[in-house]
């Protein structure tokens, strides 16, 4: 249903209502993004969007790396709830309209960060907290230890969504492709994205093909 302000209200099974403004313009920039104050990781929200029979999941092509496949996800901004952010990303990147059935939890994108200063700050905080020593003066911290202590690039809260319909016109329709995939197809497509794959594994997608 629509409210007077144009927001779309979706009734979810737990009787929570999530208002989503389906604008035709994607949000850009990071001025409103949320960040973990300790790790510096960007806080994100995303959807594992399933077909009504739960046999397929909707993947979208990455805007930065082709022909890589991902699920709709992006920054959780300061003026919205995490559920609103997840559904907004589903709309902007995949043109999907649906309802949240449950939270899948928070998952860390542990691919190496390209922000060296953030890495050093995180390591310094960890070492100071654990031993009272400044990491910059601790000569025992080797390359392997540093690798293990790398801060996550992002921390994403994923939600399982049942897709009600896919719109032909949506904000990123010229930037991305979208494709329904079976569990096995999606598993192969997401081999380089362990965070997304872990969220898929926790979803209710049917894993056995008849």
UniProtKB/Swiss-Prot annotation:
Optimum pH is 7.6. One of its GO terms (biological process) is diadenosine polyphosphate metabolic process. One of its GO terms (molecular function) is bis(5'-adenosyl)-pentaphosphatase activity. It catalyses: diphospho-myo-inositol polyphosphate + H2O = myo-inositol polyphosphate + phosphate; P(1),P(6)-bis(5'-adenosyl) hexaphosphate + H2O = adenosine 5'-tetraphosphate + ADP + 2 H(+); P(1),P(5)-bis(5'-adenosyl) pentaphosphate + H2O = ADP + ATP + 2 H(+). It comes from the Eukaryota. Its cofactor is Mg(2+). Mg(2+) 1 binds at residues 73, 93. This is Diphosphoinositol polyphosphate phosphohydrolase aps1. It comes from Schizosaccharomyces pombe (strain 972 / ATCC 24843) (Fission yeast). The gene is aps1.
């Amino acid at each position: 249903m629509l409210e007077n302000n144009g927001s779309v209200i979706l009734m979810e099974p737990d009787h929570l209502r999530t208002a989503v403004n389906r604008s035709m313009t994607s949000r850009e920039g990071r001025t409103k993004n949320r960040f973990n104050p300790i790790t510096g990781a960007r806080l994100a929200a995303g959807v594992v969007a399933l077909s009504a029979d739960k046999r397929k999941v909707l993947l979208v092509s990455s805007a930065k790396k082709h022909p890589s496949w991902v699920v709709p996800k992006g920054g959780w901004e300061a003026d919205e709830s995490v559920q609103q952010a997840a559904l907004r990303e589903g709309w902007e990147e995949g043109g999907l309209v649906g309802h949240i059935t449950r939270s899948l939890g928070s998952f860390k994108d542990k691919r190496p960060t390209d922000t060296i200063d953030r890495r050093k700050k995180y390591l310094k905080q960890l070492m100071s907290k654990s031993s009272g020593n400044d990491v910059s003066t601790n000569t025992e911290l080797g390359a392997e230890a540093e690798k293990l202590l790398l801060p996550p690039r992002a921390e994403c809260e994923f939600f399982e969504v049942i897709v009600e319909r896919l719109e032909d016109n949506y904000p990123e329709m010229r930037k991305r492709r979208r494709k329904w995939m079976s569990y096995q197809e999606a598993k192969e497509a997401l081999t380089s994205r362990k965070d997304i794959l872990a969220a898929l594994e926790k979803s209710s997608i049917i894993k056995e093909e008849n």
